[in-house]
Amino acid sequence: VFILIGKLKYKFIVTCFAMGMLLISYTRVSAEETKEDKKPVDIEADSMDYDNFLDKYHAQGKVVIHYSGGVLNADDVELDNKNNIATARGNVLLKMGEDTLQGDKIVFNIENKTGVAYKGRAFYSRNHFYIKGDKIEKTGEQTYFIQQPRATTCDGDYPDWEIAGSEMDVTIEGYGLMKNARLVTEGLPV
């Protein structure tokens, strides 16, 4: 009887060990598949550091980040690879196709393509439309919210006319809603 119980214990331990190894290998394969599902991000810079524990890159000097759907240029970028958040400062330019977003600082999710530009300037090529604002928030694939907006279709730093307001919701299709709107020409409200 004791020999039979000893053999059953041994079989139970071996079975538990085998099941544990299967679970561990399945978890490892699942994690690798998840990593491979992530779209690649290519980072170029004069200097770069990587924190393995936090999974963050810090790139400085002529930083160029290529990601699915665009390119981010800046003097200094911290990329939180785990959360797909890039925080860029200094000469920041984000290109998404023919559209551009510039700012003193841009915090951008490279996976869902949303983010915020501070002291921002945006250009939408489809409608040849420029917007400046204290804060330009890309809320979706085709939608924006702007604080203290100034919008125009005129080229150059000093447009002949622009519409200014306190806040604005806009879509790439060219529709927008501005609060406290006023027409400004040659820098003066009309």
Feature names for model-found ranges:
Residues 2-16:
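Bacterial N-terminal signal peptides that target proteins for export
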Residues 14-25:
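Bacterial N-terminal signal peptides
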